[in-house]
């Protein structure tokens, strides 16, 4: 067993994607800056998904570019498919989480990658 624990803060992605209204890029970047100031240095900053499906994650490319310029942390993003992966890479993502599903129905509805 390891003597270390690694905390990855997911609030800027998982928390904000469930808000009823989209949060501005400025507010998202400020949120991430406050997490860095609090000592959380590994942060999932957004998801490269369709803004029609999850409007709260629109402009994740701009959020990532801005926090990469600020620095001070390791910034992760989430992608559901190859299109999201390519967009994340183009935006400068260094750590990309890819989510998938064993359920064909879920994949068709949510990930659109079957």
What are these regions (language model features)?
Residues 2-6, 39-41, 69-75, 92-94:
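Short, well-ordered coil/turn segments that N-cap beta-strands
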Residues 8-29, 72-82, 107-114:
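Active-site mouth loops of central-metabolism enzymes
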Residues 8-9, 94-103:
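Non-cysteine beta-strand/loop elements that form the S-adenosyl-L-methionine
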């Amino acid at each position: 067993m390891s003597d270390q624990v690694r905390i990855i803060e997911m609030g800027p992605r998982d928390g904000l994607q469930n808000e009823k209204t989209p949060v501005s890029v400025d507010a998202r970047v400020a949120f991430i800056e406050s997490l860095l100031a609090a000592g959380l240095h590994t942060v999932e900053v957004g998801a490269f998904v369709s803004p029609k499906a999850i409007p709260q994650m629109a402009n994740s490319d701009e959020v990532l570019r801005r926090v990469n310029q600020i620095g001070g942390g390791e910034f992760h993003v989430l992608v559901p498919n190859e299109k999201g992966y390519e967009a994340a890479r183009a935006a400068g993502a260094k750590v990309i989480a890819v989510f998938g599903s064993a359920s064909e129905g879920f994949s068709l509805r949510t990930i659109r990658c079957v």
